Amino acid sequence: MFIDKIKAKANNYEINVIIEIPMNSGPIKYEFDKESGAIFVDRFMQTTMSYPCNYGFIPHTLSNDGDPVDVLVVAHHPVVPGSVIKCRAVGVLMMEDESGLDEKIIAVPTSKLDITFDHIKELDDLCDMLKQRIVHFFEHYKDLEKGKWVKVTGWENKSKADALINEGIDRVS
């Protein structure tokens, strides 16, 4: 995959997300290598937990932690690693880990991909149980890894998500 050919935004309202980890997959953390285009196994998670959403990043962005902007894509199905999915941001999970701030944009597929998410405009439109599962996952997925920790500090709205995305794009430009 030639990541340099994939834009961060499909248009003013949609982002492109490269999936690294499918929802409900085994306890394996994958990472996309930008230079080779390969997906590497980053580590086998010591907890037997699976990601509650598809997990990936926005190409050509840089977040505060030095990595591309992270995105959780809410969907009804797992998406194959390496796939590019067009999404709309609806909010952000604010958290910190042993390395510092580590925000996660929450997004849904565009209407062209799945009309069942058309009514989701903000985080408040998502099911409360899904939001609880997301928090639970991130609060505990590193529990058995020595020296690692996560603290979820709250949720922010779509405006904050859009701001973080634009800041991430600006850091690369």
From Swiss-Prot:
Mg(2+) 2 binds at D70. The keyword Nucleus does not apply. Substrate binds at K29, R43, Y55, Y141. It is an enzyme of class 3 (hydrolase). Mg(2+) 1 binds at D65, D70, D102. Homohexamer. This is Inorganic pyrophosphatase. The gene is ppa.
